[in-house]
Design a protein with these regions (language model features):
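Short glycine-enriched loops at secondary-structure junctions
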Residues: 99-101, 144, 171-175
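Conserved catalytic/acceptor-binding region of the Class I
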Residues: 168-230, 237-251
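A short SAM/SAH-binding and catalytic strip from SAM-dependent methyltransferases
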Residues: 136-151
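A short glycine-rich, Lys/Arg-flanked "PGG" loop and its adjoining helix->strand segment in the class I
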Residues: 151-163
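Class I SAM-dependent methyltransferase Rossmann-like catalytic core
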Residues: 10-64
Length: 317
């Protein structure tokens, strides 16, 4: 169920219990450095699936962007680039990434031979610095829950959006990994992940960042795994543990064997003996409205905002 958010609680500086130093280090880790190898880098399956579901929501949005930007495309899901190109064939796509080399790798990976049909269905893509008011849609899939400073990231998305442009984003919510958290708690281990922000608080932060008409939605997706090894491999592909009180050092093979044994207790008959993990996925959509001048004895407005207001006034009927 989707609904419009109108809350007044103060936003958080960052997701609860998140270590910003670790999150920032992970976000900017250069492509090609361990554990990233260009020949093997792919987007996590869950990220691709969430991107596919979020793309379907674009059918309910009447605005037709002339340009869009995909933020951190490897984590956002590489398949979405073709889907956005198909939905908005006349629009120019842009790529932005925090990690050095990511945009270049994505562009190289999508080059097809001239005789392959896929070549003719690739969207137009550019990789260049993003100017203020330069794009009509920001696409940010599965990013915010791992942002070291989410309010700064929201502000950056607001900056690059043109007036009446819109933001589409998704991230993980509080019920994510609840089965794994319970297992760790039973063992008196530090938590396996930081606490994820509630969708209502994301709505607050959107308004605080200057967005209008935020609409939030959520769903829970259950993934099952044949073995502890497969479960841990999938989790590693999605990110790292950024909890401030996570294990402080490396652990040996004995602990890993213990972890595997403990994870086997998560197997349930209703999942045919497979290990089940819950992922709460939060979806958000918001517009960038006309800037409003505060009524005061003296008011200030940025030059870029003034230009946009004058441009809108000239084009109004």
């Amino acid at each position: 169920i989707a609904f419009q958010i109108a809350f007044n609680r103060m936003p958080h500086d960052r997701p609860p219990s998140l270590d910003p130093v670790a999150a920032r280090r992970w976000a900017t880790l250069a492509l090609g450095s361990k554990p990233f190898k260009p020949s093997s880098v792919t987007s996590p399956w869950l990220h691709e699936e969430v991107a596919r579901r979020m793309e379907q929501r674009l059918a309910f949005i009447r605005l037709q962007p002339k340009s869009w930007v995909c933020w951190n495309p490897l984590r956002a899901g590489l398949n979405i680039l073709a889907l956005l190109g198909k939905r908005y064939p006349q629009a120019m796509g842009h790529l932005f990434a925090d990690r050095v080399g990511e945009v270049e790798w994505v562009q190289a990976s999508r080059r097809a031979s001239w005789w392959k049909p896929a070549r003719w269905f690739q969207p137009q893509l550019k990789a260049e610095p993003l100017k203020s008011h330069s794009t009509d849609m920001v696409w940010a899939n599965m990013l915010l829950h791992q942002a070291a400073d989410p309010e700064a990231l929201l502000a950056e998305w607001h900056r690059v959006l043109a007036i009446d442009g819109f933001l589409m984003f998704s991230c993980l919510g509080p019920d994510t990994l609840k089965e794994l958290r319970a297992v760790y708690e039973q063992q008196a281990w530090p938590m396996p992940a930081h606490e994820f922000t509630d969708m209502h608080d994301w709505g607050d932060m959107l308004v605080h960042a200057g967005f209008a008409e935020p609409v939030m939605d959520m769903e829970k997706i259950t993934l099952t795994y044949a073995s502890p090894e497969k479960l841990l491999e999938d989790l590693r592909s999605m990110g790292r543990n950024f909890h401030v009180d996570r294990f402080g050092g490396l652990r040996g093979k004995a602990w890993l064997n213990q972890l595997h044994a403990v994870l086997l207790t998560m197997a349930k008959p209703d999942h045919e003996g497979r290990l089940a993990l819950t992922f709460e996925v939060v979806y958000g959509h918001a517009l960038k409205p006309q800037p409003r001048l505060k009524v005061a004895s003296e008011s200030q407005i940025g030059l870029d905002d003034m230009r946009q207001m004058l441009k809108q006034a000239r084009s109004a009927p």
